Amino acid sequence: MSQFPLISVMTFLPLLGVVLLFFVPKQSHSVHRMLALLVSLVTFVVSIPLVTGFQSNADFQFVEKMPWIAAGPFQMNYHVAIDGISLWLVLLTTFIMPIAILSTWTAVEEKVKEYMICLLLLEVGMLGAFVSLDLFLFYIFWEVMLIPMYFIIGIWGGKNKIYAAVKFFIYTMVGSMLMLVALVTLYFKAGAGDFNVLRFYEVTLDPATQVWMFLAFALAFAIKVPMFPLHTWLPDAHTEAPTAGSVILAAVLLKMGTYGFVRFAMPLFPDATDKFTPLIATLSVIGIIYAALVAMVQEDVKKLVAYSSVAHLGYVMLGVFALNLQGLSGGMLQMLNHGVSTGALFLIVGFIYERRHTRLITDFGGLAKQMPVFATIFMIVTLSSIGLPGTNGFVGEFLVLLGAFESELRWYAVIGTSGVILAAVYMLWMFQRVMFGELTNPKNQTLCDLNAREVGIMLPLLVLIFVMGVYPTPFIEKMSPSLEKLIVHVKTKQQGAVAQVETVPAAPQVMPAAAVVPAEHK
Amino acid sequence: MVSLHSYLIVSAILFSIGTIGVLVRRNAIVIFMCVEMMLNAVNLTFIALSRHLGNIDGQIFVFFVMTVAAAEAAVGLALMIAFYKNRESIDVEDVKLMKL
Amino acid sequence: MGYELFGLPMIYYISMVAKVLVVFVFVLLTVAYATYAERKIIGHMQVRLGPMRTGWHGLLQPIADGLKLFFKEEIVPSQADKFAFLIAPIIALVPAFIGFAVIPFGETIEVAGYKIPLQIAGYYDTVSGQVVDMNVGVLYILALASIGVYGIVLAGWSSNSKYSLLGGLRSSAQMISYELAAGLAIISVFMLSESLSLQKIVADQANGAWYCFKQPLAFILFFICSLAEINRTPFDLPEAETELVSGFCTEYSSMKYAMFFMAEYANMVTVCAVTTTLFLGGWHGPAFLPGWAWFIAKVYFLIFVCMWIRATYPRYRYDQLMRLGWKVFLPLTLVNIIVTGIVVSLQS
Amino acid sequence: MLGVYLPIIVLVAVAVIFGLASLTFSSLIGQKKPSAVKLAPYECGCEPVGSARERFSVKFYIIAMLFILFDIEAVFMYPWSVLFKRLGIFGVVEMGLFIVILFVGYIYVWKKGALEWE
Amino acid sequence: METIVLPVINLAPIMPEIILSVFGMALLLVNVFVPSEQKAYLGYLSLVGIIAAGVSIVGGWGVPLDSFSGSVVQDNFALFFKGIFLLSAGLTILISDHYMKREGCNQGELYPLILFATMGMMLMASGTDLMTVFLGLEVLSVSLYVLAGFNRANLKSNEAGLKYFLLGAFSTGFLLYGMALTYGATGTTKIPKIAEFVAANGMVAQSPMFYIGMLLMASGFAFKIAAAPFHMWTPDVYEGAPTPMTAFMSAGPKAAGFAAFMRVLIVAFPTLKADWSDLLWVLAVLTMTIGNLIALNQDNIKRMLAYSSIAHAGYALVGFTAGNAEGAAGILFYMLSYAFMNIGAFAIIILVGKKGEENNNVADYAGFATKHPVLALAMAIFLFSLAGMPPTAGFIGKFYLFSGAIKAGYIWLAIIGVLNSAASVYYYLRVMVYMYMKNPTEEFDWMTLSPAVMLCILIAVVGVIIPGVVPSYLLELAQKAVLL
């Protein structure tokens, strides 16, 4: 514990920004913006040593643990650490934040101070949720995220902002409240101790209990992902949120759901995971196809992108529940990819919306002539989103489908593949309708191309799109050990449970088999 | 001698009459009188039980109940007067400024 | 006399009925002649003769008055609440008469070997060899006084006349105010007697000094408050002719009207009897006269005092009256209790 | 019990019978010539104005409330007065406190003007 | 003539009650002797009384005492609740002056009444005799009847007072009848002795009289804590009463009701836990659900908070149903934090109102955040705490309550609870929607930021946030204070 509390510093740095912002007078908008940007950049810089100092093994690193609440039967710790699973998500968060802040540099004119405070608070919540190893702490951060996001959508959103904000809040709240019940139940089942998730990993619950608790956890996460049919809040929230909100929502918040599955739902309730894998895979595939179909008929660019998110996250879920290394790492990678490319897409939508104050596809057409730089960037991002080889999207989707194909989810993978084609259809069709063709609408003829700030925002994302597409190894390398450990853990417990149910002599046979699993991948 | 049960039954009947009165009457003062009747039914119960058990606590309780009833009566009357002054009525049907 | 009913000998029942009738007739006669006496006494004090025509020195005057009232027309105002209007005089009258039940008016006498205490609500318990009376006799009297108020309020309210209503209200406000002071004043008596039983109080005074000497303040307060409570002059505001016609009984006529008057005089008798019992040693007195004679003498003396006061003092104004009750008598009674408490506990 | 209360009941009966009898008797023998004016409420010979069942001064309510409260306090003093010698000095102190508290209320009421009649 | 030997009387357990009574009476007297322009000092004086009482309870912590032959006790349970009562009374006094001045009410009697009510609550918490509990309850109730109708010129206040009085007196009848029957069945009014009797006599003691007594008592208490289906009085009374009194009623007396209810059920009827747990289960579900559902479509913010307060009683009943230490500690903690957050919210409602026109409609808050960002932030914090969002005291409280239920195996109850709590978010958010997301229709220029009210809000914010982030200390206290 004597080491530098890097994670805490990173997590709570934005809070410092919030405090500073409080003291800045209300009118000095540019100061607010600069300060927020600065803080988020510093946070990003602080988070870089996490990558450089990260040992590529399955252990939790940069651990910080100290007692927090101790009363009655409860013992909660401030326990944070990262492993391969959370590392990249943390990085993604710190990376996206400055971009998000920049994205609404000029779009948000009112209540800039409050806006920046909300963004920074949101960052605290997200980072905290990713690094928490104490379930209670995780829950707190999980809920804390809700509040600033609610305000971001509700105050700075579009026409229908209130409906969207409330819907977002209540959906998430219902899920998370049930998770809380399950969490406490789990705590009492586990016996005296603390809320350390690693401790809960070791608890063996009877399958019936697992089913209920898994359902409660899964509901919370599935709403966040969002999985079909719980996704209805997402298009509303995305459409109404300001660009930065959409970007963060797509890039980070949705990952919270999938991350939850990987970190909590699956390892905690392995038997239930086993039991529900077909259901979740079915829902994921339905999500992929359904969202793609719905996206195809959208009039609104932003809504289209929102539905594409639903489809993308379907892949992630499919990969995660394939429960093998390819699938999982594909899923994890796809999370990052989705963060980058969908984030970028939302930024792009934001750019044209700022110029034209409309997002209807029919209002555009032929923009490519007027805005060549924009068109190029848009093209690259679209291709990345479709998953063209050479871009990041490809690697993720490929691994996911590969993993799913190798697992028992083969047929789901087959159907899911069709989603790739559909994605190409609706994305490209949209791109074509917006960028090519006749420049008919007179309003579009005066549009100016991206300015330096906007290009500057997009550049890092474009770089990442290619880097991750061409050389994903460092990403996968760092996460693999943790994922392997996870797979072993889940599978062992699943089989252990089976062994317990079956005859006793079967147990010794299972143990070496479990030990072999990581060896295969080495 | 009159048995404990008779007392209890009488007080239960009184209590019920009071309760029903509160529920069906409309005049605030009558309602309050019904409440007082309930309290007195309770007092009767206490006295009867106290006598039956040979334990003085019940009688002491009655003292307090009476005191409290008096205080309630004073406050209640004051409230009713205040209400009447503003509204020219003490019908509880008129206590309806704040309905859903 | 060997028969028993509910555990009591027959002679108990016979003596009880006898006592009830004797006392009732006695009170009735006293009431009747108190009216006569009042007119006569005040008349003489004001250097006139008072009633002289009916009988020798007008001795038959009360009977003539009574007969006259019997023959008067009964008027029930058209807007009156008939039932309440009718019941009000009875409610006023009955408590006035039954207060006497707990007052011991003489020593225990012996008839055919059975001891009979001269107190209606009392009997001689052969097992314990003691006179048993109501152990909360004073509370009984206070309770009756409270019931009497209802008669007056009802009379005032049911008549549907403004004078009646105001008279009734004033009268009840006055009565309850002074009832309070009276009730508090006698607490110091109980502190000495350690009992609420009137037998016990009388016995206690026989052994020591009368309470009017031990508790002069309480005595004076109680007597004055009692006068006010029964609307005697100088506190007869409710019937103040100059202000409210006849107060609560403005609309009453005939026997109903008479009953309010009877109630008032009966109350006076009761009050004087209670004062006698509580402060003047009850029926005790030097042995040359029997106890009941002493009792009657003391009561009649107090009744005379009442009339004397009426002849002497002017009537109070209503605000003065209420102020006197609440601002003077009430704190005085409380102070008296505390002082008595301190003195008594210092003595022991 | 019975020995004490039975006579009271008898006395009540006698008093009630006396009252009812004289009422009945007088209403039987008294003359009856009612007229509208005779049955109207008395108002010094003028035509009665309005109903008598109207509001009257709030003072009366206040007196009634004060009576209830002080009377109930008196209720506590009665049992005490019977026992106070046996309670010793403690009893006096207790009742002294009680009366002091009563006095606080009393002074409050006084200063608030509830005892004034104008 | 034998001398009566009196039990030794130790005044220490009722020291705070004595202090409050003395201050209350002193204030009454001071009130009639000082001219009306100096009456503001009464408020400060009453605060001194509250603080003095607060000081007197500190020393008693962890020192169990009883007095008056076991009629009152000083235990941690009582002391914790006393702290809550003093706190809510103190905060209420802080917000009263501003409101009463604005509405033109005579404040003279206000402070003594608050002190007396607080004294009654304390007696309820520390009473271990049904008589003491009853007396405390009535001292409280009678004061509250007056306080609810305190604004005499205001029709709504009249109605609130009258309604509260009639229904309150009615419920007292039930409570008393229950006490009488319990007394009859067990032969004592002392709460621990009732338990002893039941333990000694087993099933023999559990006559119908006994059960009916318990049931009637429970319904009487349920009325006082505004648990459905005995909640009907709450919305009207809360809406009509002067706002500071509404704040007070929702915080202090409710906690007092719980204190007495808990002591009676937990101490007197431990053997019947299965029975009353079932009863409370139903009560809790009804209370939460009805409170929340009706709150959903309230436009008047006071009324909305009234229904929400019903719902909150329901959450507390969840912890009570659990009947274990966590649940009980949860109630204690929750009542404390509820006092902070609710009075805080009402303080802001008071600031927003103006004379005669209280601006209680949710729509009146449109754009409030634009005009008064700090106050709006405070309001948001209170509302989030009421909704049970971390990191606020409201969340920790709810967490404890529901944890208690889960530990006791009432998982469904906890689930109904959390779902309710999720539903409740809707109407709290509604206020925030108006504050933050609508354009201002008013200038809010009539608002005067009275320092006392601001102080109250500040204390409330601190009281909501600090226990929400570092709740250990308070939870520890609550744990030590439970009766189980």
UniProtKB/Swiss-Prot annotation, chain B:
User: Where does it reside?
Assistant: Cell inner membrane
User: Which reaction(s) does its UniProt entry say it catalyses?
Assistant: a quinone + NADH + 5 H(+)(in) = a quinol + NAD(+) + 4 H(+)(out)
Kindly give the membrane topology term recorded for this protein: Multi-pass membrane protein
One Gene Ontology BP term is:
ATP synthesis coupled electron transport
> Any one cellular component term from GO for this entry?
plasma membrane
Query: What is annotated about its quaternary structure and interactions?
Result: NDH-1 is composed of 14 different subunits. Subunits NuoA, H, J, K, L, M, N constitute the membrane sector of the complex.
Q: What InterPro entries is this protein classified in?
A: NADH_UbQ_OxRdtase_chain4L/K, NUOK/Mnh_C1-like
- The EC code for this enzyme is 7.1.1.-
Ranges that cross the membrane: 4-24, 29-49, 60-80
Which Cys pairs does UniProt list as disulfide-bonded?
A: none
Q: Which family does it belong to?
A: Belongs to the complex I subunit 4L family.
Cite the GO molecular-function annotations of the record. Answer: NADH:ubiquinone reductase (non-electrogenic) activity; quinone binding
Gene3D superfamilies the record matches:
1.10.287.3510
Query: What name does this protein carry?
Result: NADH-quinone oxidoreductase subunit K 1
Enzyme class label: translocase
Q: What role does this protein play? A: NDH-1 shuttles electrons from NADH, via FMN and iron-sulfur (Fe-S) centers, to quinones in the respiratory chain. The immediate electron acceptor for the enzyme in this species is believed to be ubiquinone. Couples the redox reaction to proton translocation (for every two electrons transferred, four hydrogen ions are translocated across the cytoplasmic membrane), and thus conserves the redox energy in a proton gradient.
Where does this protein chiefly localize? membrane
Q: What are the protein's UniProt keywords? A: Cell inner membrane, Cell membrane, Membrane, NAD, Quinone, Translocase, Transmembrane, Transmembrane helix, Transport, Ubiquinone
From Swiss-Prot, chain C:
Q: What class of enzyme is it?
A: translocase
Q: Name the catalysed reactions.
A: a quinone + NADH + 5 H(+)(in) = a quinol + NAD(+) + 4 H(+)(out)
Membrane topology, record value: Multi-pass membrane protein
Gene Ontology CC terms: plasma membrane; respiratory chain complex I
Highest taxon in the source lineage: Bacteria
Q: Which regions form coiled coils?
A: none
Transmembrane annotation, as ranges: 11-31, 83-103, 136-156, 172-192, 208-228, 268-288, 289-309, 324-344
Which cysteines in this chain are paired by disulphide bridges? Answer: none
Give a GO biological-process term. aerobic respiration
Q: Write out the GO MF terms.
A: oxidoreductase activity, acting on NAD(P)H, quinone or similar compound as acceptor; quinone binding
According to its UniProt record, the EC number is 7.1.1.-
Q: Spell out the subcellular localization from the entry.
A: Cell inner membrane
> What keywords sit in the KW lines?
Cell inner membrane, Cell membrane, Membrane, NAD, Quinone, Translocase, Transmembrane, Transmembrane helix, Ubiquinone
Show the Pfam families listed in the entry: NADHdh
Tell me the NCBIfam families matching this sequence: PRK06076.1-2 (NF004741)
* Functional description taken from the UniProt entry: NDH-1 shuttles electrons from NADH, via FMN and iron-sulfur (Fe-S) centers, to quinones in the respiratory chain. The immediate electron acceptor for the enzyme in this species is believed to be ubiquinone. Couples the redox reaction to proton translocation (for every two electrons transferred, four hydrogen ions are translocated across the cytoplasmic membrane), and thus conserves the redox energy in a proton gradient. This subunit may bind ubiquinone.
> How does this polypeptide assemble, per the annotation?
NDH-1 is composed of 14 different subunits. Subunits NuoA, H, J, K, L, M, N constitute the membrane sector of the complex.
Tell me the protein family, please: Belongs to the complex I subunit 1 family.
* Name this polypeptide is given: NADH-quinone oxidoreductase subunit H 1
* Organism encoding this protein: Geobacter sulfurreducens (strain ATCC 51573 / DSM 12127 / PCA)
Lineage, top ranks: Bacteria, Pseudomonadati, Thermodesulfobacteriota, Desulfuromonadia, Geobacterales
Q: Which gene underlies this protein?
A: nuoH1
Curated annotation (Swiss-Prot), chain D:
Q: Where in the cell is it found?
A: Cell inner membrane
GO CC terms? NADH dehydrogenase complex; plasma membrane
| UniProt-listed Enzyme Commission number(s) | 7.1.1.-
How does the entry describe its membrane topology?
A: Multi-pass membrane protein
Q: Which domain of life is it from?
A: Bacteria
So what does this thing catalyse?
a quinone + NADH + 5 H(+)(in) = a quinol + NAD(+) + 4 H(+)(out)
List, alphabetically, the InterPro entries matched.
Answer: NAD(P)H_OxRDtase_bac/plastid, NADH_UbQ/plastoQ_OxRdtase_su3, NDAH_ubi_oxred_su3_sf
**One Pfam entry name:** Oxidored_q4
Which residue ranges does UniProt annotate as crossing the membrane? 1-21, 60-80, 87-107
Report the enzyme's class at the first EC level: translocase
Q: Which UniProt keywords apply?
A: Cell inner membrane, Cell membrane, Membrane, NAD, Quinone, Translocase, Transmembrane, Transmembrane helix, Transport, Ubiquinone
A GO molecular function term, named singly, is:
quinone binding
- Give the multimer and partner information: NDH-1 is composed of 14 different subunits. Subunits NuoA, H, J, K, L, M, N constitute the membrane sector of the complex.
HAMAP family assigned: NDH1_NuoA
| Protein function | NDH-1 shuttles electrons from NADH, via FMN and iron-sulfur (Fe-S) centers, to quinones in the respiratory chain. The immediate electron acceptor for the enzyme in this species is believed to be ubiquinone. Couples the redox reaction to proton translocation (for every two electrons transferred, four hydrogen ions are translocated across the cytoplasmic membrane), and thus conserves the redox energy in a proton gradient.
PANTHER family, from UniProt? NADH-QUINONE OXIDOREDUCTASE SUBUNIT A, NADH-UBIQUINONE OXIDOREDUCTASE CHAIN 3
Q: What is this protein called?
A: NADH-quinone oxidoreductase subunit A 1
Organism this protein belongs to: Geobacter sulfurreducens (strain ATCC 51573 / DSM 12127 / PCA)
* Species lineage: Bacteria, Pseudomonadati, Thermodesulfobacteriota, Desulfuromonadia, Geobacterales
